[in-house]
């Protein structure tokens, strides 16, 4: 009898231990799962040939990804947020496949030049999530297309250029001819002509986004012909436009030479100390494209489980994703008032800005 009672008690203790152990295991597993879900999200971007220090499009995208990473306590690297830099167009597909193998939850292709590579890789890897910035990929559930109304923002800097020029000659330097840069050229030209119908507009292309020397060569030719305001939509090539304007300002501080930057606030790029010992800035304004806002926004949505695959998200004046930069010291109050007037007309639909020259 005692043996039977002891055996029964022992079996109950063992059973209790199993139940408690199971409960403890379930709790620990749940906690482990929660930790994984909150920390395991990873994201990467593949640059075009400009790289993350191009002081333009890629840099703005990287700033947005860094902001997202820091806001979510993530570290730079394969376990958090990262970038893969492309030295040439041949690197696009290679870098995208590297990102896929690293199992990033979201992979950005920065710039329309990556469209073909993303189309191919996303088709081969339907379970991975991609985003193409500045172009459109249709009918692909694992790709989000991010676009900007560049023509609207370019129209506004065209208004600034048309009202600021003293020579009635302005210039546009494009990187590579295509649908995206067409919008910059078309918007800028329309804005200039809206406020200064008699202005002459010199349009030239460098056929590259990463050749500052070519940009400087074009700028030198334009300034020599009497152009006093140049808007560049040329990525790193535009650094050469700034270099030429600063050289001219340094030699002759009284000369009015201006550059309108692109994609991000390029105020710092225009700083120069002239031969008279005084500090100047040749940046008239910049047509900002808040790539950082778009990159941060989509990463945040995707991390929360809201990846809008198969759709295109457009950012424009209504979201302050395009427009003039914050540094406006070199623009008169009258010109800024005109900019606001035309901005409202565009937002209200009273002005339809062209997308093609």
From Swiss-Prot:
Predominant location category:
membrane
Q: Where is the lipid attached (S-diacylglycerol cysteine)?
A: 23
- CDD domains named among the record's database cross-references: PBP1_PrnA-like
Annotated membrane topology is:
Lipid-anchor
Q: Keyword annotations for this protein?
A: Cell membrane, Lipoprotein, Membrane, Palmitate, Signal
Pfam families given in the database record = Bmp
Signal sequence span is 1-22
| Locations listed in the record | Cell membrane
State the lipidation positions (N-palmitoyl cysteine).
23
Q: Could you tell me the superkingdom of the organism this chain comes from?
A: Bacteria
Q: What cellular component GO annotations does this protein have?
A: plasma membrane
Keyword check for Hydrolase: no
Give the family per the record: Belongs to the BMP lipoprotein family.
Give the protein name, as stated in the record. Answer: CD4+ T-cell-stimulating antigen
Species per Swiss-Prot/TrEMBL record: Listeria innocua serovar 6a (strain ATCC BAA-680 / CLIP 11262)
């Amino acid at each position: 009898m005692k043996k039977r009672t002891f055996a029964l008690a022992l079996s109950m203790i063992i059973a209790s231990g199993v139940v408690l152990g199971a409960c403890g295991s379930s709790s620990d597993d749940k906690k482990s799962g929660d930790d994984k879900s909150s920390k395991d999200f990873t994201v990467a971007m593949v640059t075009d040939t400009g790289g993350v220090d191009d002081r333009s499009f890629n840099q703005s995208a990287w700033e947005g990804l860094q902001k997202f990473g820091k806001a979510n306590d993530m570290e730079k690297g394969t376990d958090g947020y990262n970038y893969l830099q492309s030295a040439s167009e041949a690197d696009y597909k290679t870098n995208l496949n590297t990102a896929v193998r690293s199992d990033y939850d979201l992979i950005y292709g920065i710039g329309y030049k990556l469209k073909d590579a993303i189309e191919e890789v996303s088709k081969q890897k339907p379970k991975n999530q991609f985003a193409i910035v500045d172009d459109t990929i249709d009918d692909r559930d694992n790709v989000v297309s991010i676009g900007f109304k560049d023509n609207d923002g370019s129209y506004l800097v065209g208004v600034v250029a048309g009202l600021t020029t003293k020579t009635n000659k302005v210039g546009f330097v494009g990187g590579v001819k295509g649908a995206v840069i067409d919008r910059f050229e078309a918007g800028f030209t329309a804005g200039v002509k809206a406020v200064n119908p008699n202005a002459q507009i010199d349009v030239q292309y460098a056929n590259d986004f990463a050749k500052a020397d070519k940009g400087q060569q074009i700028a030198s030719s334009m300034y020599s012909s009497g152009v006093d305001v140049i808007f560049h939509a040329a990525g790193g090539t535009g650094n050469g436009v700034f270099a030429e304007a600063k050289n001219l300002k340094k030699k002759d501080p009284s000369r009015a030479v201006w550059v309108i930057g692109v994609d991000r606030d390029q105020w710092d790029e225009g700083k120069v100390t002239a031969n008279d010992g005084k500090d100047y800035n040749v940046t008239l304004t910049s047509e900002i494209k808040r790539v950082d806002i778009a990159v941060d926004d989509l990463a945040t949505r995707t991390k929360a489980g809201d990846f809008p695959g198969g759709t295109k998200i457009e950012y424009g004046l209504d979201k302050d994703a395009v427009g003039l930069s914050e540094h406006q010291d070199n623009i008169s109050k009258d010109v800024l008032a005109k900019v606001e007037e035309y901005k409202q007309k565009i937002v209200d639909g009273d002005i339809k800005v062209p997308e093609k020259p």
